[in-house]
Regions:
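Glycine-rich loop(s) and the adjacent beta-strand/alpha-helix scaffold that form part
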Residues: 184-243
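Glycine-rich active-site loop/strand segments that organize a redox cofactor
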Residues: 56-88
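Glycine-rich FAD pyrophosphate-binding loop
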Residues: 28-50
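Helical element adjacent to the flavin cofactor pocket in flavoenzyme catalytic cores
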Residues: 126-152, 158-176, 216, 222
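Core beta-strand elements of the Rossmann-like FAD/NAD(P) dinucleotide-binding domain
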Residues: 5-8, 171-181
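N-terminal Rossmann-like FAD-binding beta1-loop-alpha1 element of flavoenzymes
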Residues: 10-36
Length: 353
């Protein structure tokens, strides 16, 4: 294994959404040399690799950043850092404008205003969100991208991070990187619990299975101060496809119902954890399977759902289309059987004459 030594001003570990956006901003605002180290390829890596159909953190008209802080605090049952939330919330709309200027399509109404989905979300066509960001970052003259490089440890000196080391995923290279500043953007930790699907499908999950929590481990091993580990976000997902449920619940107002048709969301609550807990309890008590009731939605709403999931979780749209195809085939087979029975009966009558 050969060693490659690199010196840079800023090292960004992880080339997902946060890493690419940080590289783009630094590239725009300074002449500092930036290096992105990404263990996949920045074009389609990170939690937004497949896209997203809404920006779920936006200060909509008539709202203020503190409103978002209050919502997040309530949803997490108080287990939050309000100061960090407020700092983030105050910049949400600015970042959204930057993304739109880069080419992200944000849906607008007849008056040219963003189409809101609830009090904190706006609808987008975001299947290509990650390629847009990757291109913007890579085009900066002072930004260099190292794809397929897995960073494993920080370099420290006198209690300060001075760089990092790692290795090539596809090539037999050891990387020794010195940097004046290091930004960790490796994402969260997926796969901590038993997967929904067995065997080769065990990686069918919402967040990237290769978000291993390595960035957290590197920080802990280096003696860094860590925060907000007290709260674990676990969202409700659609069976088989692991597609988000908020698109259905908020998009068409679908209610959570059990196998008896009872609306159970009011029984447990509507925070993220309560929606998951309620579904688990209903199944444990023998009231499952549980559904999001879409019966009665208009044809236009149905098409909107199809398009929305194509921007984020196409497997859900494909599952619906396949189910519709199977249903049409069953109906067609029933009609053919009915026609055959009628013809047979007519022939029998004719035979008796």
């Amino acid at each position: 294994m050969r060693t490659e030594r690199i010196k840079t001003d800023v090292l960004i570990i992880g080339g997902g959404t946060a890493g690419c956006f940080a590289a783009y901003v630094i590239g725009q605002k300074s002449e500092r040399k930036v290096l992105i180290a990404e263990k996949a390829n920045i074009k389609r890596s990170g939690c937004l690799a497949a896209g997203v159909n809404a920006l779920n953190a936006y200060i909509t008209e008539g709202r203020v950043p503190q409103d978002y802080v209050d919502y997040a605090k309530k949803d997490a049952h108080g287990i939050v850092r309000e100061d960090l939330l407020l700092s983030m919330s105050e910049r949400l709309n600015h970042v959204t404008k930057v993304m739109e200027d880069l080419g992200l399509v944000i849906l607008k109404d007849e008056n040219g205003k963003y189409v809101a989905r609830g009090n904190r979300n706006i609808k987008i066509n975001g299947e290509n969100m990650k390629p847009i960001l990757a291109k913007a970052a890579a085009e900066q003259e002072n930004v260099t991208v190292l794809n397929h490089v897995n960073i494993t440890d920080y370099k420290t000196e006198n209690g300060k991070i001075t760089g990092a080391v790692g290795f090539g995923v596809n090539e037999d290279i050891f990387y020794d990187i010195d940097a004046e500043a290091v930004l960790c953007a490796t994402g969260g930790a997926a796969g901590l619990y038993r997967p929904n699907n067995p065997g080769f499908s065990r990686h069918k999950m919402w967040y990237p299975p290769f978000n291993t929590g390595a960035g957290y481990a590197m920080g802990l091993l280096s003696g860094a101060e860590m925060t907000t580990f007290e709260m674990r976000f676990i969202a409700l997902r659609c069976k088989d496809t692991i597609a988000p449920t908020g698109t259905i619940a908020q998009g068409v107002g679908a209610r959570q119902v059990n196998a008896h048709g009872d609306i159970y969301e009011t029984k447990y609550g509507l925070t993220t954890s309560q929606r998951v807990y309620g579904t688990v309890m209903e199944n444990r008590e023998g009231n499952g399977p549980c559904y999001l009731r879409t019966e009665g939605i208009s044809k236009e709403q149905e098409q909107d759902l199809y398009k929305a999931y194509l921007n984020m979780a196409p497997s859900q749209t494909l599952k619906w289309m396949e189910a519709a195809r199977v249903l049409r085939k069953k109906r067609r087979d029933r009609r053919y059987r009915a026609i055959y029975r009628r013809r047979t009966y007519s022939q029998r009558l004719l035979g008796r004459q």
